[in-house]
Amino acid sequence: MIKNNSVVVVDIDGTIAKVGERLKYLKTTPPDYDKFYASCFEDEPIIEMVDLVKRLQSFYKIVFCTGRREQVRDVTETWLCKNGLFGDLLMRPNKDHRHDTKVKPEQLSNSGVLLQEIAFVLEDRDSMVKKWRSLGLRCLQVDYADF
């Protein structure tokens, strides 16, 4: 059993990885997620955030909770490892097109992590920050993203 306040939940895109040019694919109607995820392995790390998570790894269990699809799990795991980041990786099913505000809390619940075990969440996306906070979690917004 994990003790209370021993888990840090970390988003990936925009929080520890620079999304960059591929963000344009989410601004189309409908969003083109295939193209968006196709080049995620090229993302540059956000150095300050990667360094922070590396330090947190010594004190907390890290759970990466991302909106990325399972189809890019290998690439995502390689990217995390290359940047010295380790922890559980929660990803959405390939055909799940629901908004992150629905998917991410569900992923976390399905993983067995209890809300009281979470010390805080690192997130960039405004809608997710609001969602995490509505669940009673402390959420540190590391950047402002509205997509």
Indicate where each model-derived feature is located.
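Donor nucleotide-activated moiety binding/catalytic core segment of transferases
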Residues: H99-L115
